[in-house]
Amino acid sequence: MTAPPRFRGEVVAIDWSGAKDRRAQTTTIRVAVVRDGSSWELSGGRTREETVDYVLGCEPPVLVGFDFSFGVPAWFAREQGCTTIDEVWALAARDGEAWLAPASPFWRTRCDVPLERRYRRCEERLRAQGFPAKSIFQLVGNGQVGAGSVRGMPLLARLRAEGFTVWPFEAASERTVFEIYPTAMRVERFPGRDLTRFTSPHARDAGISALAMWRHRNTLAVLEAATDPVTRLEGDVWLPVTD
């Protein structure tokens, strides 16, 4: 098998936040960048919108990972009349704050969603591998991604409108965005790296994700678009594959 071409650019991993107020966003969102394998940086102090502004300012080629769900379970999308991910993102922009009130099937105190309807297929795969992937409908508890996902989806539409491709709905390009799951990155080892600089869980998740992305950058740079209808509606999570 021919090896993928060598990627010559930067990778950016973002530990996201669903917080509503500015201060909570700026104290939790973290951005990690690896540029040449030896130099890397961590930064914070940005809101969601400002983080997307930062990404838009990155010179191509660039690979960007966000740790929130890019879609909803297919049954919910279809129930809302959505047949494409663009329609899901537009719906989140229009109705997302009402979902977070919450409105069923989103929940804070009691989950009424049957187990078989809580997760996207990629999350079911993660859970089958022993990872505690959360449902987008869950709005409370450690690791919940509901608010961040709902508030992040409209920003994916903005990135796409500005020239980024969003995997798995499109193939990788000079400017690619994809969904990451930092918990899965923690199994990787990075000899010689000073991981003590991660002074918070947010910094750790962004930093380790960026290092993992850099390690697998050549594969990331040639990701192909999904053809499966469910994946094209729900999205997918990129996971590092060890040869």
Regions found by a protein language model. Give the residues of each.
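RNase H-like (RuvC/DEDD) metal-dependent nuclease/polynucleotide-processing core
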Residues: 2-12, 16-243
